[in-house]
């Protein structure tokens, strides 16, 4: 049976697989495109499964944002060459959009979400593995929602909403939403640059905090200072530590004469609260 070239091309467009695979599938399915699509999806998933033990260490971070909801995802591949491929970029942007639309709060939720014309997101990722020839892996997802305020965000990269590192900011206020968005974006850019470990001092891991204080106290003890002087030195060094790792205590990257908490207070809007943030860095362990 001679295959229609238009059917072969349509099959290639729908599956992303090669012309020879598409022609063979159509021949085996007596020209039935729907059956051929199912067959090629099976082939694609089988090819993807063979690559499952390989390491996906490159990739992209993508953001999808509306006024009161934002999501960041990380999709990994094996090389920068594939990370710059149009099909990979299209896939990662689609996944961010689906995660936002479905309000996914975890990687597993997104993997099980529906992906139009393919099945699930996980099947779309495995299909991408087959088409691009590298292992693809959805590794991280960050979700933020603000009921009384805005979600702002920033991703550092050449394309808007796409790069290697991104941040989401939740601001609570009844003030002007456009001004809140601008404040939030500036804080998100700060977070991307300074990579804080916690929102406030109270949010720091207590064991890590106690360990840091113990180290500083041991260092100061070796100075043989009077107890009152030693306490002031310890408090000063702890304050310096907070400035390094706590977002609200960090000096604002655009004006180091003020902390982030001061920058928020200095806005023309009243009662603005930074309630949460998320930072996603490509390749970083959770």
UniProtKB/Swiss-Prot annotation:
Coiled coil: none annotated. Residues 79-82 are annotated as: Involved in Mg(2+) ion dislocation from EF-Tu. It is found in: Cytoplasm. Keywords: Cytoplasm, Elongation factor, Protein biosynthesis. CDD domains: UBA_EF-Ts. Its main location: cytoplasm. GO terms for cellular component: cytoplasm. InterPro entries: EF-Ts_dimer_sf (IPR036402), Transl_elong_EFTs/EF1B (IPR001816), Transl_elong_EFTs/EF1B_dimer (IPR014039), Transl_elong_Ts_CS (IPR018101), UBA-like_sf (IPR009060). The keyword Protein biosynthesis applies. GO terms for molecular function: translation elongation factor activity. The keyword Transcription regulation does not apply. NCBIfam families: tsf. Associates with the EF-Tu.GDP complex and induces the exchange of GDP to GTP. It remains bound to the aminoacyl-tRNA.EF-Tu.GTP complex up to the GTP hydrolysis stage on the ribosome. Belongs to the EF-Ts family. This is Elongation factor Ts.
């Amino acid at each position: 049976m001679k295959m229609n070239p238009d059917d072969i091309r349509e099959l290639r467009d729908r599956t992303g697989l090669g012309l020879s695979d598409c022609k063979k599938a159509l021949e085996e399915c007596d020209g039935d495109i729907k059956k051929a699509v199912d067959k090629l999806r099976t082939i694609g998933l089988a090819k993807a499964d063979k690559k499952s033990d390989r390491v996906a260490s490159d990739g992209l971070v993508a953001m999808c944002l509306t006024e009161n909801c934002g999501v960041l995802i990380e999709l990994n591949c094996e090389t920068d060459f594939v990370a710059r491929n149009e099909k990979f970029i299209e896939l990662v942007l689609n996944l961010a959009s689906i995660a936002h639309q479905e309000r996914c709060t975890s990687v597993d939720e997104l993997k099980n979400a529906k992906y139009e014309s393919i099945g699930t997101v996980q099947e779309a990722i495995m299909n991408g593995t087959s088409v691009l020839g590298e292992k693809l892996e959805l590794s991280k997802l960050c979700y933020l929602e603000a009921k009384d305020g805005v979600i702002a965000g920033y991703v550092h990269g050449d394309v808007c909403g796409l790069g290697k590192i991104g941040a989401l900011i939740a601001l609570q206020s009844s003030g002007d939403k456009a001004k809140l968005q601008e404040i939030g974006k500036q804080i998100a850019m700060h977070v991307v640059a300074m990579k804080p470990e916690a929102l406030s001092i109270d949010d720091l891991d207590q064991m890590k905090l106690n360990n840091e204080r113990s180290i500083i106290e041991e260092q100061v003890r070796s100075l043989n200072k009077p107890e009152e002087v030693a306490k002031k030195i310890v408090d000063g060094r702890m304050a310096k530590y907070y400035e390094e790792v706590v977002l609200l205590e960090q000096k604002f990257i655009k004006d180091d004469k003020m902390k982030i908490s001061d920058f928020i207070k200095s806005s023309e809007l009243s009662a603005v609260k930074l309630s949460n943030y998320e930072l996603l860095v490509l390749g970083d362990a959770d």
